[in-house]
Curated annotation (Swiss-Prot):
Name of protein: Rab9 effector protein with kelch motifs
UniProt keyword terms in alphabetical order: Kelch repeat, Repeat
Originating species: Xenopus laevis (African clawed frog)
InterPro entries, sorted: Gal_Oxase/kelch_b-propeller (IPR011043), Kelch-typ_b-propeller (IPR015915), Rab9_kelch_effector (IPR052124)
Function of the molecule: Rab9 effector required for endosome to trans-Golgi network (TGN) transport.
Length: 366
């Protein structure tokens, strides 16, 4: 596995290339089951932050918070207290109060959790608010991509070992009202599973992969939260193998997945799913790729670059690949004039030989 080129602050990344992101200072130790999120700033001049929450290694679970301050490209380790140790949990930011960081579920060494905790802007400690309604049973539920507006959507999750919870209901946590609800759904829902990705895009939620016992899944489901009807999608193209413990991000009309565990071991492949054409495409890279991994975390990173419209030539248009990319060139130029490109950011995870990672890797979305 070759070394990745380092992407320095405000550098414009090349297409089809993986980079290492190397902030100054001491970052998190190698771990699995953590979550990561990009947190924007209310100040236009700010580049925002990346938060990494919790996780675990063979010695136990973490309750720490690590931050990449993108303005100074440094790690920050705040002294916030009160986060219960947990891994393979969910995290999200509510749209109506974007300063609040929420976590749900996960596990520690003795048991699974189903509690909700929140960190308010400027607060020194996490709070465990009293919530209304009936929450899902304790479970692992590893995602940071399953929220729409103020609502976290929960489907499936882990019970113990390789077994999922038997519950196949959909649950909604509304951060604005701090209330759990369980909507009535129709259609063809996924069977019980854990280690799947649950990704929100617009009003829809997409479920891919996961596992139950020794069975790995490669199917794709969708539920529109306006109609609450499940649909099993008939996808085509470069179908990803059956896998679990992978990660996902949504951008434009696409869902990207990276890594995970298959029946033959961990992978470092990346796929793009077009939600409009139902087409999967395996992405190819001109550089080395990050080491294969599972149980890592991934988020969408708006990356501010030195503004230079001449750089548009460095981002070749792939319009011939899919018809809905015909305006790629003009969109690319506009993005570069604004000085922003969108990256996929991954941190941590492990391979099937037990090696844990503590690296930050990025690639531009295409």
């Amino acid at each position: 596995m070759g070394l990745l080129e380092v992407l320095d602050p405000e550098d414009l990344p090349k297409m089809s290339t993986w980079y290492a992101l190397v902030p100054r200072g001491e970052g998190p130790s190698a771990r699995v089951g953590h979550t990561c999120m990009y947190v924007s700033s209310s100040e236009d001049s700010s580049k925002g932050k990346i938060l990494i929450l919790g996780g675990a290694d063979p010695s136990g679970c973490y309750s720490d918070t690590h931050i990449i301050d993108l303005d100074n490209h440094e790690w920050d380790n705040p002294d916030s207290e009160g986060l219960l140790p947990r891994y393979e949990h969910a995290s999200f930011i509510s749209a109506s109060n974007p300063g609040n960081i929420w976590v749900f579920a996960g596990a520690e060494q003795a048991e699974n959790r189903n509690c909700v905790q929140v960190l308010n802007p400027g607060a020194a400690s996490w709070k465990s608010p009293k919530v209304m309604g009936t929450p899902p049973s304790p479970r692992t539920f590893h995602t940071s991509s399953a929220a729409i507006e103020d609502k976290l959507y929960v489907f499936g999750g882990g019970e113990k070992g390789a077994e999922p919870v038997a519950d196949t209901n959909l649950y909604i946590y509304d951060a604005a009202t701090m209330t759990w609800t369980q909507p009535v759904t129709s259609g063809d829902p996924p069977q019980a599973r854990h280690g799947h990705v649950l990704t929100a895009l617009g009003t829809k939620l997409f479920v891919h992969g996961g596992m139950a016992g020794s069975t790995f899944f490669k199917d794709m489901f969708c539920i529109d939260t306006d109609t609450m009807k499940w649909e099993r999608l008939k996808t085509k193209g470069d179908l990803p193998p059956a896998c679990a413990a992978h990660s996902s991000v949504a951008w434009k009309s696409y869902i990207y997945i990276f890594g995970g565990m298959t029946s033959t071991g961990a992978t470092n492949s990346m796929y793009r799913y077009n939600t409009e054409t139902l087409l999967w495409k395996q992405l190819k890279f001109d550089s080395a790729c990050p080491p294969a991994r599972l149980d890592h975390s991934m988020c969408l990173l708006p990356w501010k670059t030195r503004t230079n419209t001449d750089n548009a030539e460095k981002l070749p248009c792939k319009a011939k690949e899919e018809s809905n990319l015909k305006e790629c060139s003009s969109a690319t130029s506009k993005t570069l004039e604004q000085g922003i490109v969108h990256l996929c950011f991954i941190f941590g995870g492990m391979d099937t030989d037990g090696e844990l990672h503590s690296d930050c890797c990025v690639t531009i979305l295409q």
